[in-house]
Each structure stands twice: as structure tokens, then as C-alpha cells.
Amino acid sequence: CMEPKKVGPCRAAMPRFYFNSASNKCEGFTYGGCDANHNNFQSEADCKKAC
């Protein structure tokens, strides 16, 4: 949860969530589809549960 948001180099447009440690909230972003880190969740609920 402390890793930065990582969009990745691919060009897909997948809606995902990450934990923003600055705001202390799970926030949405558009994921490119490859080269993710561990701060990448399919739903806001999954993000909140993990972080």
C-alpha cells in the first residue's frame, strides 16, 4: 500500500484503485494493463480491505 501509483507502459485503459499515502485514501486511476506493482486493486473495497 505504500508503493506509488503505477500506470505501467501498456496502453489498455483498466479502471483500478490504489492507496494514496498522502491523502490516506483509496483513489481511482487508469491502469495500462501491464507492469503493475502491489498497490493496484480491482475495486475500492479490495483497496480498503488491504490498506
From Swiss-Prot:
Molecular function GO labels: serine-type endopeptidase inhibitor activity; toxin activity
Pfam families: Kunitz_BPTI (PF00014)
GO CC entries: extracellular space; nematocyst
Keyword match Disulfide bond: yes
Tagged with keyword DNA-binding: no
Disulfides per UniProt: C1-C51, C10-C34, C26-C47
InterPro entries for the chain: Kunitz_BPTI, Kunitz_BPTI_sf, Prtase_inh_Kunz-CS, TFPI/VKTCI-like
Primary location class: secreted
Family annotation (SUPFAM superfamilies): BPTI-like
Compartments where located: Secreted; Nematocyst
Keyword annotations from UniProtKB, A to Z: Disulfide bond, Nematocyst, Neurotoxin, Protease inhibitor, Secreted, Serine protease inhibitor, Toxin
Job description of the protein: Weak serine protease inhibitor that has been tested on both trypsin and elastase. May also act as a neurotoxin by inhibiting voltage-gated potassium channels (Kv). In vivo, is lethal to zebrafish larvae.
Family label: Belongs to the venom Kunitz-type family. Sea anemone type 2 potassium channel toxin subfamily.
Protein name: Kunitz-like toxin PcKuz1
Lineage: Eukaryota, Metazoa, Cnidaria, Anthozoa, Hexacorallia
